[in-house]
Amino acid sequence: MKKTATIALFTISSWGFLQSQNRPLSSKELAGQLNTVTTMVPFLTITPDSRSAAMGDVGVALFDPDANSGSWNMANLINAKNKTGFSMSYAPWLRNLVSDVGFSYLTGYSKVGANSAVSGAMRYFSLGNIQFTDFDGNPTGQFTPNEFALDGGYATQFTKKFSMGVNLRFVYSNLTGNRAYNGIDYKAATGGAGDVNLLYKTEVKSNNGGYDKIQFGLNIQNIGSKMTYSSKEKRDFVPTNLKMGVGYSHKI
């Protein structure tokens, strides 16, 4: 009898739970369940150099680093063969659709002593000339939206195997030309961000009697403040992301 009562109680409780789950949710409850993280200034995630782009964006743990390595892993510039270097690139964007959208990148580095390096970079993204209109389709003027970021980086080698680097970044984005829409004044957005980079390298003995090289790289990119184009709108994150990579070198 006791067992029967227990089962009946469980059945009633379960039915009540299912009934509560089937209750329609209010719009306020639905809004509270939305936890999508939105970001802005996506141009910060564009691959700046053709070398890493051709290899599928695997620049975090490259052997033989060059000037562009400051964007992928600042700590890897310690291993650059040359004392100084610079790189400049330009990529047309959606060239088959428009002719005035493009991404430009300029970077350079210099070694300081035997165990340190500094770098600087600028990336610029132009969205081309745009005709703005009001809600009725009447033209309100033309503007060329543009975005840019200025970087300054430093790297140091703590041991023969371990090095660390940081990048500090100023971000500017102007998409509206300081226009007002629907009673809201829009402006250029500014913000700050930074990268933290780590590199660990070691050697393992190979079958041919030599040593193979292994590198592990990590880059936490765009750790920064929220940005907004209007004081009346919510602020959005910059696109923070994590990059990890492994490099292996074997002499044949």
Describe the residue ranges of each PLM region.
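Bacterial Sec-dependent N-terminal signal peptides
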Residues: 1-23, 246
